[in-house]
């Protein structure tokens, strides 16, 4: 993780402000700190909400401070995802192959390059990895946590709804003979709907 962190930091230019999509996330996070929670028609607000927590501690008129904060958070989340990927690997492989899996994830060039842009991908990936980690447990109760994280993925990116679909398919294929199969899945679905309902209600109010 530390070596991968070094690569990520090496690829980032902290001397220039964010622009393009990461600019939108930064401006939205600043708006959230000022009480504006309006949504984009094509972009989730989970990442900007997460960033706004940290922006609340910044009192600066220099936009570069906000730019570098969102970059640092993105890098931090991406780095934290590496040991999570190892834990997912351990559900299927021994320690050696799990380490290989996490290393491939840690040093994938595209992921390292994008992690320093301040985009939503690292947090989205972490939510997906966490969701798969819990669904790979043999106890059906963990589907509740898995679907909760699927709801978080939807907050981060609208296409995160596909995480819910994939988790559902995996759940019924791998745990179909388990006791309390439908009860725990039903609880997970209720929690998933509770998590995403604020997004759905707000989007319906804003965009119809």
Describe each region flagged by the PLM:
Residues 3-7, 101-109, 133, 150-154, ...:
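Short helix- or helix-capping micro-motifs
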Residues 7-8, 183-208:
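Membrane-lumen/periplasm interface segments of specific transmembrane helices
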Residues 14, 76, 92-93, 107, ...:
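Transmembrane helix irregularities
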Residues 14-26, 38-54, 61-64, 68, ...:
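Extracytoplasmic catalytic/substrate-binding loops of multi-pass membrane glycan-assembly enzymes
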Residues 72-92, 130:
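Transmembrane-helix motifs of polytopic, lipid-linked glycan transferases
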Residues 90-93, 131-145, 153, 173-177:
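Membrane-interface transmembrane helices that cradle and orient dolichyl/undecaprenyl
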Residues 144-146, 159-174:
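Transmembrane-embedded, aromatic-rich helix segments that form part
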